[in-house]
Amino acid sequence: MKKVENLIIGFGKAGKTLANYLGNKGEKTVLVEKSPLMYGGTCINVGCIPSKFLATAADRRSFSGESDAEYYKNAVLQKKALIAKLNKANYDKVASNENVEVLDGLASFKDEHTVQVRNGSEVSEVYAERIFVNTGARPFIPSVPGLEVGRRIHTSETLMDLEEFPKSLAILGSGFIGLEFAASYAKFGTKVTIIDQGDKILPREDEDVAKEVLASYQGLGVDFLFGAALLQVSQDENAVHLSYTVNGEKKELSVEAFLVATGRQANTEELHLKNAGVEVSERGFIKVNEHLQSNKAHIFAMGDVNGGPQFTYISLDDFRIVKSFLDNQGSYTRNERQPVAFSAFLHPTFSRVGLSEKEAREKGYKIKVATLPVTAIPKAKILGNQTGLYKAIVDAENNQILGVTLFGEESHEVINIVVLAMMTKQPYTVLANQIFTHPTMAEALNDLFGAVK
C-alpha cells in the first residue's frame, strides 16, 4: 500500500492546481484520474474551451467558401487538435512535479483514509492523511423510453466530437447549455429546434431580458416547442425520431442529431463515499462547510462535485479556499467570495452578476432599475450585432449595485468591471462617471448607470 500526505481524486482545475501547490511545498501527493481524456478537467476537454472554439468558428462561417459540411468538419478537427495539445500540456505540468504521482484509474473509498484505484484488472491502494475530491459533474439524462446516448443522440460532451455535419438538430432543454449549442449550430447552417416542457426560456431571468434572448434566437431561425413533454425516442441509421405531446396532442419530429441539455449531476456514485462516511445531498453532491471540508474534516470537495456554481473559475477559487485552510489561515472561505459573475455564450453573450430585478424585489429591497438597449451602443454597430439589453439594479437606500445583466456582444468582458465595483462596494455613480475608452462596449456602462433614477 502506498502512503502519502495528500490524495487528490480528479484532474480538474482545483485538483491539478492543488497538486502542484502541494508538490512544490515538498509534500508527497498522488493525483488519480479516471480517464486520460480528462487531464485538465471538464473545461479544457469537454466544456468551456471546445464549445467556445466551435462557437467562434461558427461566428466566422460567413467568411468561408467551403460547404457547410466541410467547414463544420474542419472546425471539429481543429478543435480536437487544440484539446489534445491542452490535455497533454496539463498532464505534463503536473507529472513533471517530482513530488506528485499521477495514477490512471477509477478511485473508490475503502475507508475514510484509504482509496482503491482500479485500472483494468489491476487494483492498488493509497492511504492518505488528507483526501481532496475533484471529480466534477456530468450531463444528466432524464428517464425517457429509448433515450440512450449513441451515434445520433448526444450530450454536450459528445456532440462536439461529431464530425458529420447535422442538417437538423433537436435540443432537449432551453437552459444556457442548450442555448449555447443552438446558436453555434444554427450559425453552422443546421436547422435547430429546441424542445422544452416550460412555457418560456430562462425562467429564472427577468422577463424583459428573456424576451430579448428569445427574439434573438428566432432571428437565427431557431424554432421553439414550449410546453412539450418528450414521450419516446428512437434512432436508426439516418435519424432520431422523437414523440412528444403539446397540450395533450401527440406529435412527431425526426432530426439527424439530438442533444440532451437537461442539466448536470455529480460524479460521486463510483466513489463509494459511504465507506468513508462522507455525507452527500439528495442530488449526490458532497456536503461541505465554508472551508470545503466534508463531515470528515480531512476529506475536502472542490469544484462541481460540492454543489456550488459549476464554473472552472469557481473550481480555481475552491483551490484558494483550501490553500488558505491548509496554510493555517482559513481567512478566505466560501463566504468571502461574493459576488460571482457568469457568462453564457449565447447570441450574443449573456452575462450576469448579483440579483435580477425579480430576485431583488423578492428579497424586499427598495430598488432603482435602469435599462439600455444595445442598439444605443456605437461599438455594437461596429461589431455588426445590435441585439441585446443592458440592465442594472441598484439599492435605492444606499446606491450600491445589487445586480447587472448584460445581454450583448463582449458582455463577458464588460461584466468583470461591474464585479470589481460591487466587490469594492462602489456606489453606482462611479460607473456612471467612469472615463472609458471609445468605442467600446464598456463605455455603455456610463449610459446604463446614468439612467438610474
Question: What annotation goes with each model-predicted range?
Answer:
Residues 15, 175-178, 315:
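Catalytic nucleophile loop
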Residues 2-4, 21-27, 33-165, 193, ...:
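Glycine-rich flavin
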Residues 48, 135-191, 195, 223-224, ...:
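Glycine-rich dinucleotide-binding loop and its adjacent helix/turn
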